[in-house]
Design a protein with these regions (language model features):
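A short, charged, Gly/Pro-tolerant segment at domain boundaries
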Residues: 202, 216, 220-240
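Residue-level detector of flexible, active-site-proximal loop/helix-junction positions
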Residues: 64-66, 92-94, 159-162, 175, ...
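ATP-dependent adenylation/nucleotidyltransferase module used to activate substrates
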Residues: 1-140, 148, 178-186
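Residues that form generic nucleotide/phosphate-binding pockets
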Residues: 10, 14, 146, 210-213, ...
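Solvent-exposed amphipathic alpha-helical surface segments
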Residues: 18, 47, 51, 214-217, ...
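Short, surface-exposed helix-loop/turn micro-motifs enriched in polar/charged residues
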Residues: 131, 195-199, 221
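Catalytic subdomain that performs nucleotidyl-dependent activation
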Residues: 57, 136-216
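Generic structural signal for well-ordered, non-membrane alpha-helical segments
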Residues: 4, 110, 200-203, 207, ...
């Protein structure tokens, strides 16, 4: 099976299981420039050809304002796919690192990026936003919430922001990070290196390492955690 067919099978199954796409949807795909968002963009673009429900996609990048940011290869990639590309310019980096000098910037940064993405999606006439969270992101988020916040929870596969009138969908839910990395390498996607000084210095990276260590002695651990989340209907996850 080709890498595209394999990834399409993951995405279509998630989209169908959670009714993520309806006829006439105009979907903003959040593009950070990383492997996850670029994979999602190419697969959703390809799926437009045959999916029974007709939809449009718009690619949106929130430019945080780091000096040296260059999304020209992403723009060319979108042109080849026939997808409109919007770069939302912001001063998020300056606000967080220069003005507020945040010691723990990740939470505020994520909140500000989400706000900018949602605003840009509305301006582009979109009714949904597709995010590139995959299988491993879901497991890591669930474990982080349990370890650091003492609660059982995760992001939802599909949700609705009533204040924005925007749906949020995560079509890569069934694809592992390994699947995404393989797809990225085979398709030679134009990944943009993150310029954030806090990149890889996060609780998520620590949880990723912990799960990798636990998996060595407990094969299939991530899949069992994911299955437990579905069985318990954590935040909209469903057993299939």
């Amino acid at each position: 099976m080709s890498e595209m067919r394999r990834m399409l099978s993951f995405v279509r199954r998630a989209v169908d299981d959670y009714d993520m796409i309806e006829d006439g949807d105009r979907i903003a795909v959040g593009i950070s420039g990383g492997k996850d968002s670029l994979t999602l963009l190419e697969v959703l673009s390809e799926m437009r050809i045959f999916y029974p429900k007709k939809y449009e996609i718009v690619a949106i990048t929130v430019d945080m304002g780091f000096e040296g940011s260059d999304y020209s290869e992403v723009a060319e990639f979108c042109r080849r796919l026939g997808v409109k590309y919007v770069i939302e310019k912001t001063d998020i980096a300056k606000i967080i690192f220069d003005v507020r000098k945040e010691s723990n910037p990740c939470s505020l940064c994520a909140k500000m990026r989400r706000g900018s993405l949602h605003s840009a999606a509305q301006e582009a006439g979109c009714n949904k936003v597709a995010l590139g969270h995959h299988f491993d992101d879901a497991v890591e988020t669930f474990m982080m919430n349990m370890f650091f916040e003492g609660r059982l929870g995760c992001f939802s596969p599909k949700s609705y922001l009533s204040n924005r009138k925007l749906g949020l969908i995560r079509p890569l839910l069934y694809a592992t990070e390994k699947d995404v990395q393989y797809f990225t390498n085979k398709r030679k996607l134009p990944v943009v290196t993150s310029l954030c000084p806090e990149d890889h210095a996060t609780e998520r990276e620590n949880m990723k390492k912990l799960l990798a260590q636990l998996e060595k002695d407990n094969k299939g651990l991530r899949h069992r955690i994911f299955h437990a989340m579905c069985k318990a209907n954590i935040d909209g996850f469903k057993e299939k």
